[in-house]
Curated annotation (Swiss-Prot):
Residues 37-86 form the F-box domain. Keywords: Kelch repeat, Repeat. Kelch repeats lie at residues 143-189, 190-236. It comes from Arabidopsis thaliana (Mouse-ear cress). Gene3D superfamilies: Kelch-type beta propeller. InterPro entries: F-box-like_dom_sf (IPR036047), F-box/kelch-repeat_ARATH (IPR050354), F-box_dom (IPR001810), Kelch-typ_b-propeller (IPR015915), Kelch_1 (IPR006652). This is Putative F-box/kelch-repeat protein At5g03000.
Length: 354
């Protein structure tokens, strides 16, 4: 939808799509060209905004170069209000990277999903707080919640939220107990947090946060349909409101793997080895292994530089016990000086919708 709307916008602006770069350099974004009158000049602003609202946000820097009228409309808060009114949303991938070891505040980046030009761009301003290690991340709408973790080597009750619309970070009310590597899930608009504390008292088993009232309440094993496990992988082994016990399934979880739930299947993807390991909770109790990458080797470090690669993989069921993976695209999205392993700089990722 976004591509077709973009072509319509360029047509009405009196220019061809190929005349504009997908994402201009930063020094070009402040420039605007004086264009002759176009079809847009005779259209009401409401209709123009309705058209622009259907175009991906990542094309806005290019559209701002069309003329001063476009630049003004794109900067107007009415554009986001129009998107909200007509129900246009996009999924945005955010990643948190520690690319500078001398800076205790890591940077958040977002992936620009423009076809053939995918790249990671830093958000501004940078993260204002010291980033807790072993924290848990969940997202609701356009906000990413950062729950607990180690701060100055101590378990923390702190909860932060990053608003991905404004790129502003703020603190929320603290949890009742400090928690590290807790499991978390969003159920009916509320954030359930389980485990991660030293307490063995069942009264401290978990707690739930209500974003509407901004309050925490304790939860018990009978409050919601949840089951505990001895070692909870940070917020990843949560499916449909249940924390699944993987004990005995012989799955090795590490920082080079991504664990997600798709259609009631728990999928673990090994980034460096190009291997997909998956588990279907309805059909079997064993982990199955599938090869999903054409390229099985991946160089994270090269000649004193670190390269970050990103891939989009679509999964498809094909009969009993079969899961096929297709690499939609795969490319380098970010490079910085220094040779580190992925666990040294990659902290967290989250998908937000707005």
């Amino acid at each position: 939808m976004f591509c077709s709307c973009l072509e319509i916008v360029f047509f009405l602006a009196g220019r061809h799509h190929s005349q504009f770069p997908s994402l201009p350099d930063e020094n070009e974004t402040n420039k605007s060209s004086d264009s002759p009158p176009t079809v847009f000049s005779s259209l009401p602003d409401e209709l123009i905004l309705n058209c622009l609202a259907r175009v991906s946000r990542f094309y806005r820097p290019s559209l701002s170069l069309v003329n001063k009228e476009f630049q003004s409309l794109i900067a107007s808060p009415d554009l986001e209000a129009t998107r909200s009114r007509i129900g246009v949303t996009e999924n945005h991938l955010y990643v948190c990277l520690e690319s500078n070891k001398n800076n205790p505040n890591p940077r958040w980046f977002t992936l620009a999903p423009i076809p053939k030009e995918q790249k990671v761009k830093p958000i501004i301003p940078s993260f204002p707080y010291q980033h807790p290690t072993s924290s848990t991340f969940v997202s609701i709408g356009s906000e990413i919640y950062i729950i607990g973790g180690f701060v100055k080597r101590k378990r923390s009750r702190r909860v932060l939220v990053l608003d991905c619309r404004s790129h502003q970070c703020r603190r929320l009310p603290n949890m009742a107990l400090p928690r590290v590597s807790a499991a978390a899930d969003v159920i009916d608009g509320k954030i359930y947090v389980v485990g991660g504390s030293k307490s063995k008292n069942i009264d401290n088993w978990g707690e739930v946060f209500d974003p509407e009232t901004q309050t925490w309440e304790p939860i018990f094993p009978t409050t919601v349909d949840l089951t505990t496990q001895k070692s909870v992988f940070p917020g990843k082994l949560v499916m449909g409101g249940k924390v699944y016990d993987m004990d005995g399934l012989k799955v090795n979880l590490n920082l080079n793997s991504c664990v997600v739930e798709i259609d009631n299947m728990m999928c673990q993807i090994s980034v460096c080895k190009g291997i997909l390991v998956w588990y279907d909770s309805e059909e079997d109790l064993v982990w199955n292994k599938s090869m999903v990458f054409d390229r099985l080797g991946l160089d994270w470090t090269k000649e004193g530089k670190t390269e970050i690669w990103c891939a989009e993989i679509s999964l498809e069921r094909r009969g009993f016990g079969e899961l096929w993976g297709f690499v939609e695209w795969s490319k380098k999205v970010f490079t910085y000086d220094g040779c580190d392993s992925p666990s040294d700089f990659f902290l967290h990722s989250a998908i937000v919708t707005y």
